[in-house]
Amino acid sequence: MGMSSLKLLKFVLFFFNLIFWFCGCCILGLGIYLLIHSKFGVLFHNLPSLTLGNVLVIVGSVIMVVAFLGCMGSIKENKCLLMSFFVLLLIILLAEVTLAILLFVYEQKLKEYVAEGLTESIQRYNSDNSTKAAWDSIQSFLQCCGVNGTSDWTSGPPASCPKGSAVKGCYIQAKQWFHSNFLYIGITTICVCVIQVLGMSFALTLNCQIDKTSQVLGL
């Protein structure tokens, strides 16, 4: 009974982490794609490296490393690797909770920073090709104009702005897009946390099962 339970846990944890690893590869690939094709980072000169592409590259790389530890720990029945996998998942989970709390506490300051960064970047529209490309992409995608409206463009709105008198600013449109997709973002976040907790549970259970099997076999 002990050996069959051990084998079952091994393969469950292995395939769990294999899927986890492939997800990490996809996230890493998407991050690299955004780094190559996206210019949104130039809109914020204070934190030019804090872009979605960079974040996805870091997240994808971390997921791949953690999943690799989980795969190797389960197949090799290595308690050290399993506990490393458990600790890393716990650290990631705590970091996510901390980030969520910080975003909630400093939500207003974050909004002000984003609005100020976008307003400053408008002044570089005609002098910086990267900034111009980023603004054109945002305005075309969100069907918006400027930060708060067409009045932000002192020399007249660019061609990427949609035509019409009731055009909204990109800051408002971005907030509306986030609010309209909040349910999907929340469900995705909860699913990620549940997967992490399951991974930690599998790792601890397998670790305990290895101990029990070793005692039965007299190892």
From Swiss-Prot:
GO terms for cellular component: cell-cell junction; immunological synapse; plasma membrane; synapse. Keywords: Cell junction, Cell membrane, Glycoprotein, Membrane, Synapse, Transmembrane, Transmembrane helix. The chain crosses the membrane at residues 12-32, 55-69, 81-106, 182-206. Belongs to the tetraspanin (TM4SF) family. It is a multi-pass membrane protein. The gene is CD53. The keyword Transmembrane helix applies. It comes from Bos taurus. Residues 1-11, 70-80, 207-219 are cytoplasmic. It is found in: Cell membrane; Cell junction; Membrane; Synapse. Coiled coil: none annotated. This is Leukocyte surface antigen CD53. GO terms for biological process: positive regulation of myoblast fusion; receptor clustering. Structural component of specialized membrane microdomains known as tetraspanin-enriched microdomains (TERMs), which act as platforms for receptor clustering and signaling. Participates thereby in diverse biological functions such as cell signal transduction, adhesion, migration and protein trafficking. Plays a role in the activation of monocytes and B-cells. Acts as an essential regulator of B-cell development by promoting interleukin-7 receptor/IL7R signaling. Also promotes, in B-cells, the BCR signaling by recruiting PKC to the plasma membrane in order to phosphorylate its substrates. Interacts with SCIMP. Interacts with CD45/PTPRC. Interacts with IL7R. Interacts with RBL2 and PPP2CA. PROSITE patterns: TM4_1. It comes from the Eukaryota.
